[in-house]
Regions:
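Long, charged/polar, soluble alpha-helical segments
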Residues: 1-150
């Protein structure tokens, strides 16, 4: 599911890129796509921890491209990012093993930031919501990086 959600986000970004060319965003999207491909390969090879790390990095790169390309409606941009980070957190919660205490602690930090981001968005505090969303994504990435190290 994590790879599917990553692919959906990349498809959305490629459509946005067609409307709003941006070399930096295109490079981020290409790197994200490569990471998702790597995640698929690692999953097929039975290397789940490495796959989690690669998929999360791919989605993080995609979110960076999202911030670059989504210059229109700020509320919609932040809302989509909050949704994407929420999906990332859901997937990580499922994929992290029961023995992953340190990773789960980072995941809880990410969830706390994400919850605050969603509340800030609902309150119309878009700058704060964006900052908290970025903090949530960074904590999720740290959890995945810890999961990827044996």
């Amino acid at each position: 599911m994590a790879l599917d959600r990553g692919a959906v986000l990349l498809a959305e970004l490629r459509l946005a890129l067609a409307e709003e060319p941006n070399e930096t965003a295109e490079a981020l999207i290409d790197r994200a796509d490569a990471q998702l491909d790597r995640a698929r390969e690692l999953a097929q090879a039975g290397r789940l921890r490495g796959s989690i790390r690669a998929a999360t990095l791919g989605r993080a790169l995609a979110l960076e491209a999202h911030w670059l390309l989504s210059r229109g409606d700020a509320g919609a941009r932040v809302e989509r990012a909050i949704d994407a980070v929420g999906e990332l957190l859901e997937d990580l919660a499922v994929e992290l093993g029961p023995d992953a205490a340190a990773e789960r602690a980072e995941l809880e930090t990410a969830r706390a930031h994400w919850t605050e981001a969603a509340a800030a968005w609902k309150a119309g505090e878009l700058v704060r919501a964006e900052q908290l969303c970025r903090l949530a994504e960074a904590a999720a990435r740290r959890a995945a990086e810890e999961a990827g190290t044996p």
